[in-house]
């Protein structure tokens, strides 16, 4: 319990004001938050444009950038967090970091290797229900694989919310779901 060191990764829209606002919210709750810019200043108006740029950079390069941004802050253990695509980045890093203190996933997950093993890593996922990028079958399989890997997983579903429902600048925004998300996320971080 106390101040967590958090690295918060943006979605395929890039490092937008909503990510900075989320970081400020977490800082106001007493945490240290880093917000790496994996897209090096580029932001996008549509998810399709952002996904095309993500694919142009490539998974390996994006993970390299994420590791380089996180490494200087990881001595005492990080909480990895991210929005949508950023959640998948956060998940990859958290599952590979034996010092990881937690994983906070906002609107997105990633596949994991069959041999992934963690020691009761606390994980909290916040996801729209339904979500256009994370089907019920996918989420069920993801949950079971994370549990089998040893993670302590908590899932919060938000019926009727849009995919990136915590971003007030997008049509997906749902103020009530966003507020419930931040309340639960703050409680999760306080429990670590």
Task: Give the positions of each predicted feature.
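Serine-hydrolase catalytic machinery in alpha/beta-hydrolase-like enzymes
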Residues: 2-75, 164-166
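Alpha/beta-hydrolase fold nucleophile elbow
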Residues: 73-83
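Gly/Ala-rich beta-loop-alpha elbow adjacent to hydrolase catalytic centers
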Residues: 82-86, 90
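A conserved short beta-strand
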Residues: 99-109
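Short, proline-enriched alpha-helix->beta-strand connector loops that line the catalytic pocket
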Residues: 118-123, 150-152
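Short beta-strand/loop motif that positions the catalytic acidic residue
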Residues: 125-127
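Conserved alpha/beta-hydrolase "acid-adjacent" motif
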Residues: 132-138
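C-terminal catalytic histidine-bearing segment of alpha/beta-hydrolase fold enzymes
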Residues: 152-192
